[in-house]
Amino acid sequence: MGTVVGETELNRLNNGLSSNNGSSADEGLEHWNPLKKIHSADSSRRRSTSSQLNQPSNYHMHSSLHEEVSVGSSIASPSSRIPDKAISQYYETSPPSSTSSLSSNNQLMNSSVILSPGQFLPDDANAYGPKASLPPSEMPSHFHPLWSKSASKDSNAFNDPSAIPNPSPLFSSAYATRINGSLRNDKWNRSSFSEALSSSRFSRPQVGQQQPLSSAFPFQPVKQPTEQPGSLHPFMQESKTSPFATRRPSLNTDHHGRPILLSPLNYQNSSLNPSTPSPFGGSPVMHPPVSNLSPRTPAVPMSSDGHLAPAFDFLNENPIWSKRFSISSIKYSAPSTSNASNIAPDSAPPASSQFSVPFNAAAENINDTPDSVLANSPTPRHLPYTWSRHSTSGPSRSTVLNPSTSRMSNYTGLESHLAQLSFKRRSNSATLPSLGSIRPFPISEHSPNINPLDEAAVEDEVKEEKSRFHLGHRRSSTADNGTLSSNVPLYPAYNSSPVQTRTSLFSSRLSKPSNPIVSSVSQANAPKNALHSMPSPTSLANLPSNLSDTQYKKLYNLYLVEFKAGRADVFYIDDNIKLSLNLNDYVVVDADRGQDLGRLIAQNLSQSEVASHIEKIPSDRNGQLQNLDGAILEGDTSQSLHPKRILRKAQPHEVDQLIQKTQDEAQALLVCQAKVRQRKLPMEVLDGEYQWDRKKLTFYYHAKQRIDFRELVRDLFKVYKTRIWMCAVSGTNMSSPASINASTNQFVL
């Protein structure tokens, strides 16, 4: 900020200097100026021009736009009788002390200053006033809360000496040069209140930032420094001008909205501020100082990473805020070989690595990969970034699935996101997902280009099933008339992955709810109506009793398959499918709107064995059903058996999934028990069972009275997004199928 020193202050200063030792004004000036060598060398020239200095004139001083100096701060200057060369002198790197007088030697530069001709420096004497506090020069600048050292920018410095106008006795300060002959003039900048409290000042030393020159007029050209090859310094070269460059809006700085006095010395070459001829010859006389009422160009504090951005470095380790870089537009250059392992590949991982990771590790991979990449890049700190706020429940859907921020494959990120949506709704008593709880699904060879978002629309699929199925549950049977669906097979015939933990559930959709799903092997070998060649076994208990066991086995070829907790059911194999099975083999069978996996415990059942199994089935197993409104739905109450098909023999990797299925069932049991305690229901949940394709989740409970668990089922459906069945049992012992007394079964679509 520029300041005008009038005649009154100059005369008062002259009188004060003269009264110090009772000598003349020149002697007082000698005492005030520590540069005795330079002053003695020019003493004769000053005396010869002293008569010209008696003319009434104002000495204007210019302040750099980088400095943060209050409006009221000023510095006393010599009177009109003092030569102008003394005014052009500069302070030392430390500002003047508030307790020192004008005759103190620390207010002017010391005697070691070397003046080199051909360069001149603007008058910075007004940068520090007598009332300004003195920062300790011994202390590093970045530890001081108010002062910092930066490189000044000389608006009047030109590499061409011919650019200097013809000097005159009134403007002898044009011969002033940079101190110490250096291309950089380090000086002190006073920080604003917000910058002084910023944590970035204490993280690392603040680097002086160069601001472009501003004009007192809104549309006056602003000089932008440019660096050209072979130049000594970018600020010593000619600068390009922008014809419509104006001041930008100011931030909350000390000079916001206050007038800034600018010396006409800045605009001697400007066409908007014409000059008049000087009565003494030489350089023209400038107009009086102009008051600039526009906001001052703000000095934006620099963050620790070198960006001209708000200093939010204290948020780097904050769990709520994080810095997000735009990776999609980055063109990586060749990194160093030592840190090459930290850089994530741009391409998706191969098919052999499409397996899940824990969600916490997945989130760290998403958040930390951009930072690790940028840390090893040759130019990492010039990239745009934004501050994003985390959700308390984990990364949002757009954060995990956004390809510009995630370095994982779409399938792994999608599965991690779906698992997080499922587990974050659990109660506090439930355990967090383990390593195997988040399972990827293999990409079907028949649909390699299907968008994962289309395949994984679980909620849309559930809504679609509402319109397909009625509330009353009906067991699937081969007696239904209709054409089999020829959709893409649900499971591939062979899977090269030996450690697969979950199969795909999103690639097939039924066109008819009661039609069974045919595997790729059986669908390729079976004719169109092969599965309907068997007589309708709607009620095997009503078959004629005069059939022999051989005829019975030849006609029906029934098998008994056991599932969890001793639950068993009767199945058959189509005669047109050549499938050789042995006892204790694991088979994939038709189940309730899906597929299940069980162990073969009996084959070629005789009529007596079937009758014995029918007697163990409770009469109300398929009887009373409740819908969501609690209404009783009448069903088939007779003791009948509806066998289903055995699709194929289970693969080894499918059998390995039973271990993970058991772990998921244990977690589901904990969640259900926590929900029961939360709602204070008088019931005891004994066990939980997943259907092998995860399309159905059954909870076995024991209660002494009728339980209204509709709200409980809704809560469980929000967590698992699958059909929930509540099956009542007679007691805590579930070792045999006879112990199951399914008095109430409820499901949710």
Swiss-Prot record:
In this chain, composition skew of type Low complexity spans: 13-24
State the Gene Ontology terms under molecular function: mRNA binding
Q: Where is the composition biased (Polar residues)?
A: 149-159, 238-252, 265-275, 388-405
Tell me the superkingdom of the source.
Answer: Eukaryota
Any idea what this protein is called? Uncharacterized protein PB7E8.02
From which source organism is this entry?
Schizosaccharomyces pombe (strain 972 / ATCC 24843) (Fission yeast)
All copies of the PSP1 C-terminal domain together span 644-729
Q: Which Pfam families match?
A: PSP1 (PF04468)
The positions making up the signal sequence are: none
Region annotated Disordered sits at 1-58, 124-170, 200-291, 385-405
Cited PANTHER family = PROTEIN PSP1
Which InterPro entries does UniProt cross-reference here? Answer: PSP1-like, PSP1_C
GO CC, sorted alphabetically, is:
cytoplasm
